Amino acid sequence: MDAKQTRTGILLALAAYFIWGIAPAYFKLIQYVPASEILTHRVIWSFFFMMALISLSRQWHQVRKVVATPRKIAGLALSAVLVGGNWLLFIWAVNNHHMLEASLGYFINPLVNVVLGMVFLGERFRRMQWVAVLMATCGVLVQLWTFGSLPIIALGLAFSFAFYGLIRKKIAVDAQTGMLVETLWLLPVAAIWLFGIAVSPTSHLSQNPWSLNLLLMAAGVVTTIPLLCFTGAATRLRLSTLGFFQYIGPTLMFLLAVIFYGEAPGMDKMVTFGFIWTALIIFVLDALYIQRRVR
């Protein structure tokens, strides 16, 4: 892998995780729109955006291959439900002053990925990975025991996205085709909800100001652009290298929540964050050690 490819991959990875990290600022701009409606716009406009991208890149043969494989279509139906639920929970959390907990979910996610890899893919834990996962578990249990609360939103986001990643890994479909089929599965539900069920001051596009409609349509761009950057990075970087960028997103979310949106982290959250951050430091140092040994 040459230096130019690596540099391009790093820039694409930075772009992907930067956009994911500041995405809450976009959702805050339209926080007066119900989360369910924002989700429908995210699905609808992502579908049309992906249609345009696949047409421009002439990748319809990939779509036909997937459509002709019932197992992959069924797998993408399940992944569509998971990613749809993840999107809805994330939008609701951001627009109801739970951005800190959303960031916690994406800090926890890499550790959940490791657990699912062991349970479903037969991957073996290294000793320090066990320590990291146990440390994260302790953080959640301490919050439950001491403060009588569970980070439900964080756990929901972490596990839904981890299971989504597991299914996508199992069915092995490229990112563009996968997102097109997933949004196609969700499209009828989104259309029925938006045009037949939703009743709110913003549910009728013809009555909205054009500026709001443009922001709602931008949901497709906010969804697909970082995904394409991530896919481009994944093809140019080692997976172990790419993994170190994944903490940019939740770190930016945490900073946005505290500095710009006035979410004060209470003692319960800070205790949990402390355990999770310690677990992630152990996790990253272990990965660096293994990477150096392989070299």
Task: Give the residues covered by each predicted segment.
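Glycine-/small-residue-enriched transmembrane alpha-helix faces in small-molecule transporters
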Residues: M1-E37, L141-K170, I192, L256, ...
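C-terminal-most transmembrane helix of multi-pass membrane proteins
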Residues: D2, Y247-R295
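Hydrophobic alpha-helical transmembrane segments of multi-pass membrane transport proteins
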Residues: F18-I22, Y26, A77-V94, G156-I167, ...
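Membrane-interface interhelical linkers
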Residues: M1-A15, F48-L76, R127, M179, ...
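Structural motif at transmembrane-helix junctions in multi-pass transporters
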Residues: Y32-E37, L88-G105, L228-F245, A264
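Helix-helix packing/entry segments at the starts of transmembrane helices
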Residues: L104-I108, A175-W185, T224-I259
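Hydrophobic transmembrane alpha-helices of multi-pass small-molecule transport proteins
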Residues: M128-L144, L157, D268-A287
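Alpha-helical transmembrane segments of compact multi-pass small-molecule transporters, enriched
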Residues: W45-F49, G105-V119, V189, F245-F260, ...
